[in-house]
Amino acid sequence: MDRIAQQYRNGKRDNNGNRMASSAISEKGHIQVNQTRTPGQMPVYRGETINLSNLPQNQIKPCKDLDDVNIRRNNSNRHSKILLLDLCAGPNTNSFLGNTNAKDITVLSLPLPSTLVKRSNYPFENLLKNYLGSDEKYIEFTKIIKDYDIFIFSDSFSRISSCLKTTFCLIEKFKKFICHFFPSPYLKFFLLEGSLNDSKAPSLGKNKKNCILPKLDLNLNVNLTSRSTLNLRINIPPPNDSNKIFLQSLKKDLIHYSPNSLQKFFQFNMPADLAPNDTILPNWLKFCSVKENEKVILKKLFNNFETLENFEMQRLEKCLKFKKKPLHQKQLSQKQRGPQSTDDSKLYSLTSLQRQYKSSLKSNIQKNQKLKLIIPKNNTSSSPSPLSSDDTIMSPINDYELTEGIQSFTKNRYSNILPYEHSRVKLPHSPKPPAVSEASTTETKTDKSYPMCPVDAKNHSCKPNDYINANYLKLTQINPDFKYIATQAPLPSTMDDFWKVITLNKVKVIISLNSDDELNLRKWDIYWNNLSYSNHTIKLQNTWENICNINGCVLRVFQVKKTAPQNDNISQDCDLPHNGDLTSITMAVSEPFIVYQLQYKNWLDSCGVDMNDIIKLHKVKNSLLFNPQSFITSLEKDVCKPDLIDDNNSELHLDTANSSPLLVHCSAGCGRTGVFVTLDFLLSILSPTTNHSNKIDVWNMTQDLIFIIVNELRKQRISMVQNLTQYIACYEALLNYFALQKQIKNALPC
């Protein structure tokens, strides 16, 4: 406005002192661009204008008022219906019918956004859908508009010699829309010159009563039920609907299939070596072994996955409604709630499964000891012992929160994958991120493709932050021995935090499920041999490609050491916690320790996986967890030994209870990560060498164990096993596992 005022003060004036309009010619010689000036006062900036009379084959005709005889003149006796489009965007510029006798003219208020109107690649149908807000109103609009063949445009300013560019663009798009969808030889387009308020009332011949009276109307709607009016009211959704929009943004990768389309997009692959209801299978998996029931199997898995999605939506809704209670109120409510009881309406109850398993174990012990000792009567009928504190669900159903993940959005690789508060990994308070070196600056600049990633570490606040996008996973009600950390692929700005998680939790094995092709897609970043971290020293000691004949599997051996941060990394303006001691926000320098990384490159995002490779990965992972020296020695001697841990050796009891957590990541840390954790946990609790801490009968139960595991994992991290393809792959993979077990069993000598 200052620039316009300066032009006004310095511009030419006529003999009466009025401001004269200055004109300029655009790059297209036939378009004259005029800057609008208001005589005798401060100019009102309306944007550039176009002289339509200079355009070749211009089909837009001028009309002085709504009584212009040219509007209704045609070469036939056909009665034409007229639609007046009021393009004024101001609150007092809408017109309406002042007299219902004017049945041949309909007034429609259409204040479309000028930014979208001027986009050449944004057609009128998209403008209309965006303005109306629903496909139903768009369809209704097209049904009504097809009856009109004369269209008058009014923006209360434009003339043929000086038409606003926004109005011109809208008219051109509207003409293309009408001529394409509703072609007619009687189509006419007029521009009403001047304001509707300045236009005299049309007489429509000698009958002065039949008129359209331009009148200001503050409402943005006209009644759809009237013959001569259109309703384009935009209904603003109630506040509760905004929650649904937010939840849909978290589940934006979800694709819904109909039961009839399952056969078109999916097929369920069953190994040929398995017989229907094969005895080698657990009871709950036998329904997937009947080849003739492929449609039924797919439909059941589809329904189960939809149920999982509905459960997750309910949890996310609780994130929006949850109000954190004080600690004393939470403890009081837990005491009042008392022990958890079995609800028959639930799809499954882990507590009930535990009681059944304990009862069966007790019965077996009694049978085995019946000949050796006499069991007192008062013990034979005793009820099962109460569950320990470890048996309780990790998070009560009302305690789901995503607050820290939303607040620390710059540390998330994806905006819709956030960690739950009750299970997220919390770091000790960190100081301000280090100054960016030349090498790290290069890494950071390449990460601009991520909207959630900070472009520069200097932009970080010096406020201590314990956040990392990672969750602890532990299914204590099934088997408490196996612990996982699911996380996203670290960003350049969070690599120090990533290695801090490893050092704090004494992680020995990292499972990386990213392919090299995803590096170009910026789905992950190399977090070793990288200068984006400063508080850790990572030394790559050795690398093996395609280990144990697993194509695309790389084993890397890292030596990890925590180092003291530089003093200049901590700003003097930062508030140190506690007593201001640096040790309260930093880690002490540690002795170097070994971390193994297994990277599997042949698992593309949102796709299935070769179960043979997963079984080998599972065994290699166990070897690195429980017997790393022997396994590394065999690799150094170029001897492939993926079976250092024999699943059939029931005498071999691994120290699973004291094992370190397994850190698993893909890109987002939920899809492929969820599938691997599900399968790894299943293979562990089904193997006699690692299932000695099972709390439920994983063989004889009738409830679907994969459904249970995925649901329990989703209680701890969002979107674990992210889509239907991955969910079906879990069942196919487990069937392949038992088919391989059957082959091994049949190959053994009798």
Curated annotation (Swiss-Prot):
Gene Ontology cellular component list: cytoplasm; nucleus
Keyword Hydrolase: yes
Keywords, sorted A to Z: Cytoplasm, Hydrolase, Nucleus, Phosphoprotein, Protein phosphatase
Annotated Pfam families: Y_phosphatase
Biased composition (Polar residues): 330-348
MF term (GO), any: protein tyrosine phosphatase activity
EC main group: hydrolase
Domain Tyrosine-protein phosphatase: 383-737
UniProt modified residues of type Phosphoserine: 258, 430
Catalytic residue positions: 666 (phosphocysteine intermediate)
InterPro entries: Prot-tyrosine_phosphatase-like, Protein-Tyr_Phosphatase, PTP_cat, Tyr_Pase_AS, Tyr_Pase_cat, Tyr_Pase_dom
Subcellular location: Cytoplasm; Nucleus
Cell membrane in keyword set: no
EC number assigned by the record: 3.1.3.48
Catalytic activity: O-phospho-L-tyrosyl-[protein] + H2O = L-tyrosyl-[protein] + phosphate
Region annotation (Disordered) ranges: 1-20, 327-348, 425-450
Subunit (UniProt): Interacts with HOG1.
Miscellaneous: Present with 149 molecules/cell in log phase SD medium.
Family to which the UniProt record says this protein belongs: Belongs to the protein-tyrosine phosphatase family. Non-receptor class subfamily.
Function: Major phosphatase responsible with PTP3 for tyrosine dephosphorylation of MAP kinase HOG1 to inactivate its activity. May also be involved in the regulation of MAP kinase FUS3. May be implicated in the ubiquitin-mediated protein degradation.
Name of this protein: Tyrosine-protein phosphatase 2
Lineage of source species: Eukaryota, Fungi, Dikarya, Ascomycota, Saccharomycotina
